[in-house]
Amino acid sequence: MIILNATKFCIATFLSNLGDVIYSVVIAWYIADVLQSGFLMGAVLFSLGLSRFIAGLLCGPVIDRIGAKLFLWLSDMIRAIIVLVLAILLWDHTISFVILIMVSVLFGAIDAFYWSASESIKPRLVATEYLSRLNSQYFTVVRTTIILGPLIAAWMVESISIEHSLIAISILYVFSTFLILFIDSKNSHLENMNDNNDKTSYFSDLRLGFSFLNRQKMIFYLVITMFFVNIGANGVNVLFPFLAKNVSGDAKYLGYIYSSMSMGSLLTGLIFSVKSIHKVELKIIYLSFLLQATGIAALCFTQNFLIILIFVFVIGLITGFIGVLIPTFVQRSVPIHLLGRVNSIMMAISMLSTPVAQFIFGVSVDYFNIKYLFFIAGALGIVTSLSSLLINERKGTPRETVM
C-alpha cells in the first residue's frame, strides 16, 4: 500500500507538472505569435512570480490545518477549469491582457499551494528511511517533464492548434486529480496535528512557522544560503545562450548544453530512486553547494565545448543531489504538523532568487564579458557556501526531529 501510494503520487505529479510545462510554452507562444507583445510577456511572468511568492509565504498554515492531499486535488482541479475556460474563450476571441494577467496571478498562487502541499505530503506516504528515495523519484519525474514538456507543446501548437492544446492540458490536470483521490489518507495530516491547532488563529499559525525558522537557526541559515546560491545557479541559465553563441553561433549547441545539464540531474535522480540516503547533514548540503558553485566558476576558464559539456553535466549531477538532499533534510528535521508552514516559507524565499538572478545577470550581459559573469556566479555560491560551512561547524549540526 505504501509503494502504491507513492507510485500514484509520482504519476499524479508527472501529469500535473507536464500540464504546467506545456501550458507555459503554449501561452508564451500565444503571446509572442498572436499578441506580439514583449511587455505582456514580461507582465505575465512578473505577475506569476509575484503571486507565487506572496502565496508561498501565506499558504503554509492553511495546508497544515486542512491537509496536503486536499490542496493537491484542489490545485489541479482549479487549473483544469481555468485552462478549459481559456480554450473556450479562444474559439472566437483573442484573450485580453486583463484575463491573461488574472490567470497568471491565479496560477502563481495555485503553484505555491501545490508545491508546498507536495513537500508536506511526502512524509505521510512512506517511512522516514525511504524519504530520500521518494524525493529522488519526485525530482526525476519533475526533471523528465521539463525535458518532454516543451517538445510536446511545440508539437501540439503546430499540429492541433492552441485551443486543442489547452483542452489536452486540462485533461492532464483532471487525470492527476483522479489519481490524487485514490491516495490512501489514513495517515493524513489531520491525524498528526497538535490538538491546540484547532484553537489557534490563522495568523498565530503563520507566526509559528516564522518563529520555528527563527529558533532553528541552522535551518534559517540553510534558507538564506539557498537564496544566494540560487542567484548564481539560476543566473547561469541566463548566460547559457550567450555561451553557446560565443562558442559556435549555432542554436543546436544551446540544446546540447541544456541536455547535458538535464542528463546529469536525471542520472542522480535515478540512482537515488533505488538507493536510500539514511543520514543527511547540513555539512553535506553545503559541500554540495560548494562543488556546484566551483563547477559554475570553472566555466570561465575554458572555450572548449566538450569540456564545457562535461562541466555542465557534473553541475547537473550535483544539482540533482542537492534536489534530493534538501527536502529529505527538511522532512526529517521539521515536525510534521509544521511542514506546510516551513516548506511554504522556504519555497517562497528560494523562488524569489529566480527573478533576482534573471534581472542581475540579464542586465550584466550587456556590460561584462560572459566568462567574468560565470566566475561571479560561481564565486557568489563559493563564498556563501563556505560561510555557511564555517557557521555550521561553529554551532554544530542540528539533530533531526523524530516524527
Residues covered by each model-derived region:
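Transmembrane helix interruption/hinge and helix-loop junction motifs
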Residues: 35-37, 93-96, 158-165, 301-306, ...
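Short, flexible, glycine-rich and Lys/Arg-enriched loop motifs at helix boundaries
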Residues: 81, 85-103, 279
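Helix-loop boundary and gating motifs at the non-cytosolic
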Residues: 1-51, 211, 215-261
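Helix-interface capping motifs at the ends of transmembrane segments in multi-pass membrane proteins
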Residues: 32, 88-95, 307, 316
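Hydrophobic alpha-helical transmembrane segments
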Residues: 97-102, 108, 133-191, 255, ...
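Juxtamembrane intracellular "pre-TM" segments in multi-pass secondary transporters
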Residues: 1-3, 186-223
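C-terminal transmembrane bundle of multi-pass solute transporters/carriers
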Residues: 47, 57, 65, 69-71, ...
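Substrate-agnostic recognition of the 12-TM MFS/MFS-like secondary transporter fold
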Residues: 8-24, 48-61, 67-82, 99-157, ...
